[in-house]
Each structure stands twice: as C-alpha cells, then as structure tokens.
Amino acid sequence: MTIRNHTLGFPRIGLNRELKKAQESYWAGNISQAELLAVGKELRARHWQQQANAGVELLPVGDFAWYDQVLGTSLLLGNIPPRHRNEDGRLDLDTLFRVARGRAPTGKPAAASEMTKWFNTNYHYIVPEFQQGQSFTLAWQQLLDEVDEALALGHNVKPVLLGPITYLWLGKVKGPEFDRLSLLDAILPVYQQVLSQLQQKGIEWVQIDEPALVLDLPIEWQNAYQVAYQALTGQVKLLLTTYFDGITHHLDIIKNLPVNGLHIDLCAGQDALQVIHQALPKDWVLSLGVINGRNVWKADLTTRYQQVVALKGKRPLWIGTSCSLLHSPIDLSAETKLDDEVKSWFAFAVQKCAEVALLAKALNAPEGEYDEQLAQYSAPIRQREHSSRVHNAKVAARLQAINAQDGERTSPYQQRAKVQRARFNFPLWPTTTIGSFPQTTEIRTVRLDFKKGRIDTTAYRTNISEHIKQAIDEQERLGLDVLVHGEAERNDMVEYFGEHFEGYVFTQNGWVQSYGSRCVKPPVIIGDISRPAPITVDWATYAQSLTDKPVKGMLTGPVTILCWSFPREDVSRETIAKQIALALRDEVDDLQKAGIGIIQIDEPALREGLPLRRDEWQAYLDWAVDAFKLSAAIADDETQIHTHMCYCEFNDIMEAIAALDADVITIETSRSDMELLEAFEHFDYPNEIGPGVYDIHSPNVPNVEWIVGLLRKAQSRIPAERLWVNPDCGLKTRGWSETRAALANMVEAAKYLRQNV
C-alpha cells in the first residue's frame, strides 16, 4: 500500500501580501474588479505549483478565499443576509465584501455581519446568519471554477469543502430564536449538488472539513452527522477532516459514518493512534496530521516517522499537515536576516510541504533506508535543546520565587475605586479610546525608513513625537476624557513588545492572515523571556506632558502576547505566560513611578486561548488569570488598571474575567448589539465596564442616535456610574476623517446622556 501525502490548505495572501494589497486597492477604487480577480488567479496558480514542486501529491483546491472560507461557504449556499443583497438578487464579489465590511465599491452600505475567532486560532471568520425556514441554493461557483483552474494546470486535485454540520454550528440565529440544526435538510441538497458536479469533473477525493468534531457537541448535533453523511455518500470519496484537537470522544460516531477516510490532528490532539486505527473500518484511509500547520518550527522527522511507522501496511495511510498551512508564514527562504542557527530551527509553509513529502517518501521506502536523511534533517531541532539562547537562569530563578501575594492588589476594588475617583474626578459616561489611532502612510513610512537605516534616531523620534502630539491634540479637540498616545511607534501590539524582550526573534516576511486583508507578523518565542529595559515609559510620559488630562499607558497582556506569538514547544504555555507577566510587571511599576495614572493591559486573546474541550478550561483559566494578575498587581491603589477584550463570548468565563480584578474592562459589543452585556448583568460584574459602541472593523460612521441607543441598552444592564464609553477596538486600520466623525458622535452621545439620564 503506497502512502500518499497532501496538505489541508495553503496560505492565500501571497509571499509579499499581494492579495491584501489588491483587495485594499480595489476597495479604495484604485483597481478594477477584473484586476483583483486576476491577482487571485495568479496567486492560486503559484501556490499550487509551490506545493507540487515541494512534492505534495494531492493539492487542496477551495482553500483560497476572498475574505474567509466560512463566508465563502455562505455564498456557495446562497446564505446572504437580506440587507447585503443586490436588488436583482444576484451574488457577486461586492456582495461578499458588504457582508464582511459593511460596504463595497458597489451596493448600499449596511451593518457588517459579526466576526469571530476561528476555533482557538488568531484567524477570524464572518459568522453566518440564519433565519427560520430559509432556503439555500448553489449560488456561488468559486469552488467549482477553481477546481477547473487547477485541473487545467494538470494538478492532482483534492477539493476542500467546509462540512454542513460545522457550518451550521459556526453560525448564529438572527431574529426569532430557533434550532439552526433544523436547517440541515435544506442545506444538504446544495452539498449533494456540489459533490455531484465535482464527480462529473473526475474528482476522486473531497476533503470535507468538520472541525466541530473536536468539540464537546450536544447529542442532537452528534446524531446529525449520520443524517448528513448518509445524504452525502456515494458520489466522490469523502475524507472527513478534523483539526485543532483530538476526536477520540466522538470515535463511536465517526467510525459508523458512511465516509471513506478520516484526517486527525496528531500535533494539537492527544489521540492514541492505535486506538483510532483499531476502531476505524480497515478500508478507510487514515490521514495523519503529523506536520504542525500552526507553528514555525521544523519537525523532528525521526520522531514523526517512529510515531506512524507501526501502521505501515496495515491500512491505507496518508501523511499530511495537522491543519491548513494558512496559520503558518509562507516561505523561510525569503528570510535573509535570521542568523543561521535560528533559521535552522524553522520551517514555514513551503518547507512544511517538503516535510510532508519527505516523511511520506521515507515511509514508502524499505525500513531504515531514510534514517540518516531524517536524522540529518532533524538535527538542528535537537541541537536547539542545548542552546544558550534558549535558557536563562535568572528568569528561571525569578519564576521559582513567585508567591500568591505577588498576584494580589493592595486593596479590593471598592476601596481602590474611591481612591481613583478622588484622583481623576471623571464625569458620568467617561469617554476614551482603546489605544491606537490611524496608522497613516506617513507613520508607516517613518517606521520603515528608520528600520531600513534611511533616517537616524533623532529624526525618527522627532517624527513620532509629532504624530503623538497630533493624536493628543485631536483627542482634546474632540473632548475625550481619557486620552491615549496613539501608538504611532508600534507596528503591531505584540511584535512591538517582543522587539524589546529577550527570548524573541522576528521575521522580515513571516506574515499570516488574521481576517480579510488584515495580516499579522507574529514574533517567535525561541527562549526564556525577560525585559532588559523600560519599553513604553518614554513615549507615555511625553504624551502625558502635552495635556492635563490622563493619558493611558498601553501594554499588551501576557496571554495575548503568548497567543499571538509563535510559541516554543519545549515548555508549557503557562511557563511562557508567567515569564511575560514578570516582564510586564516591571513595566507597570516603571509607568506608575513615572506618573502614568491609568495603565491598560490588553487581553483580547484571553478567550481564544481556551482549550476546545471544556474539561480542560479551568486549568487554563487558572494560569491565564494568574499571569494577568502577576503583571498588574504591582499597581498602587490610585493607579487605575484597564483591560480590553474583543471578539469574545463571555457568558461561560465570567468568573475568570471578574477574577482578573481590572478596575475597568472595555469589550467589543457593537456588532452583537450589546448582547454580550447579558453576561455581565447576570453575573453582577462588580467593576467598571466600557461596552464598545461602534464597530471599528467597518468604515461606516455611527450616528449619535445609534450610539445613544446602544448605551441605553447598556445602562439597562449596568449602572451608569460604572459605564464607560469607547469604540469596540483600536483605530489603527481606520482613516482620520471617519475616526474624527465617529469619535465626535461618540462624545456627543455621552454628553447627551449626562444631560438626559
């Protein structure tokens, strides 16, 4: 039995972020839709060829998306909210962009659909909206067209389709409540149609993604799998594909499904391979996700080989990536500034494709034939264990010395609140922003020129100072109560801190997609983390010197820095988070000693870090909360600690959020129409809260009445004296004109409420 190899998906953005640049040019009206479509086509062809050149046998087709793959599935099924439809009912690319962004070059603007995290990653998807009794039709040909493209180029094609159960699971009911699983019967005929058309094109295998199978599913959702796949069987071979965790808890359901194979994630999951093998029908393909699609580390192929060789010849096997390579940067060969030692530890998407191919080749050869080649390939990752760049004795000693008192503020919130009110004397409904202001071309050019050595430190600091002054002046003109310095010096809220920590390295081109055209370049944690010197104090004190109003110090929290970095794999996430927390603790202390009275420690990734299985939640929340408190508890009573969270469902982690003991929490609520506040109301959240009053991911400017309406909803759940007024998130991706207009309306709404409540 020959062992085949494949990938579950490939990054779509392009090595130089060509997709991002083309999307944004199109949205700005600088290129035509035809030009945008041409960029997409060129990227797909390039990416298929890169995988084929690396030795990948079965190429994923359908992993390309103009925004995200869930939204692509919504279009495929004709599931478009009425407010985003064209008047003639047809779907086009602008329809897709209106759903995602609230506006597009054509069509009427309307509120964007909600966006949330893709499982426990830092990737996002647009949440499908469902209404009772709605119908579905095959309305979007993108997948079928792309299959034709790949076939025409001579590739061995494996289409990728998001499965019906996971699609329904990821969506949300809009309007009167009903069981969205009841829509399954309406959706299945469209899936049947798609599979039929793929069969007619000569497709043998379809990768049907059902990552919901790694979750704790209600019994009715578990049972729905049999119904769904009974309807879908018989046209093409189906590879039921799971990732991000194990599936042993649903093995009894899976083994009885009428599919032809199963893909499991052996990097994130703890499944016992022999148990899975014994349970599955012997003629099924078992696809083993042994090359980690979510990190940048080279695989120890010797270990991976030993992990799977026992199954060789016992059943049909495929070797693959654990998940889509979407979560990995594209090509390590583009990194020319990493030193040779560190570079030898890494593998990006292209290199991971080669790992998949090499491992499959070794498994297909007589046992032992590739031992030397695998050992040679894996040698750097083994040598790393002894590198002095990885281990720091001082950090280890400081971690060892942490005690329970280090995580507790001096006084409880009620006492701190009195001290802080006396210090700041804010009005009711105090207004603020979340931290960043528009990152203009000018700001980005200054940072790039400094990075490339085209300007010196003096010129750089003068330029950044001017932008900070502009941000302070703008906020004073608008009448905001608590100001921020605008973060002109920061390229990214995690990378900026990583650049000032020891234990990190940075890539030139290690971009990964976060959502739509938004890309991030996560830093890589290669060793123990420490802070050699203050990071934010200079800019914070400069900004504070420009105004009598308080200026917030802005830090990214330990859990978010961890979640939005590529972490080490040789120590626990808890250890990394606490190392970061100790570094931030020193920064908090330096800020307050420098006269900064309000310090925001952002933790937008707190929920994202949750394990996918609920029985593992508490252990994670315990150390995540401990890490935050360790970073913040050095603050004096009169220092007000804020935190910010976004894209969150809070109901099930309210105790942990309250346990953070931040004086003020700001959250993203506008897209969900303040629904998230129900959690705070039912829990009787004791501290202050700033529910986001407008969606910064959309360029639409909210009017005063809209904001007042949202704040009245908020006030029906939280007493006015504990409410703050702020946008959903930072404003770095917005333009100044829409930012001014939106903040002016926000301040006006707060003033109106002060006079009318």
UniProtKB/Swiss-Prot annotation:
PANTHER family: 5-METHYLTETRAHYDROPTEROYLTRIGLUTAMATE--HOMOCYSTEINE METHYLTRANSFERASE. The lineage of its organism: Bacteria, Pseudomonadati, Pseudomonadota, Gammaproteobacteria, Enterobacterales. This is 5-methyltetrahydropteroyltriglutamate--homocysteine methyltransferase. L-methionine binds at I434, G435, S436, E487, D602. InterPro entries: Cbl-indep_Met_Synth_N, Cobalamin-indep_Met_synthase, Met_Synth_C/arc, UROD/MetE-like_sf. The keyword Hydrolase does not apply. CDD domains: CIMS_C_terminal_like, CIMS_N_terminal_like. Its cofactor is Zn(2+). Gene3D superfamilies: 3.20.20.210. Catalyzes the transfer of a methyl group from 5-methyltetrahydrofolate to homocysteine resulting in methionine formation. It holds the Pfam family Meth_synt_2. It is an enzyme of class 2 (transferase).
